Regions:
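Conserved hydrophobic/aromatic packing and binding residues within compact polymer-binding modules
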Residues: 14, 28-29, 39-42, 68
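Short basic helix-loop element that most often maps to the first helix and adjoining turn
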Residues: 12-30
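Short C-terminal boundary/hinge segments that cap the last helix of small helical domains
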Residues: 62-73
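Hydrophobic micro-packing sites on short alpha-helices
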Residues: 54-58, 68-69
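Recognition helix of helix-turn-helix/homeodomain-like DNA-binding domains
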Residues: 34-47
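Short, basic-rich loop-to-helix N-cap that marks the start of a DNA-contacting helix
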Residues: 46-56
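A detector for short, charged/polar N-terminal pre-domain segments
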Residues: 1-9
Length: 73
């Protein structure tokens, strides 16, 4: 699987969980202590996310890191 397709699947999963929790990108960014535009870039697969930020986003969404990883990864 290409690096780009992994980023796309990860971003889709973040968006799916965020929307299911009725959170805006801005609200998630605040909870994760990252910039709002960063969340958008992750969801659109425009940014290569670090492990530290994966953990921040997982914690902000109250999910485990593995929950952010698509089952097909």
């Amino acid at each position: 699987m290409s690096k780009k397709s992994i980023s796309i699947k990860f971003g889709e999963k973040v968006r799916e969980i965020r929307v299911s929790q009725n959170l805006s990108q801005e609200q998630l960014a605040h909870l994760a202590d990252v910039h709002r535009t960063y969340i958008g870039m992750i969801e659109r697969a425009e940014k290569n996310i670090t492990l530290v930020n994966i953990e921040k986003i997982a914690n902000a969404l109250n999910v485990k890191i593995k929950d952010l990883l698509d089952d097909n990864l």
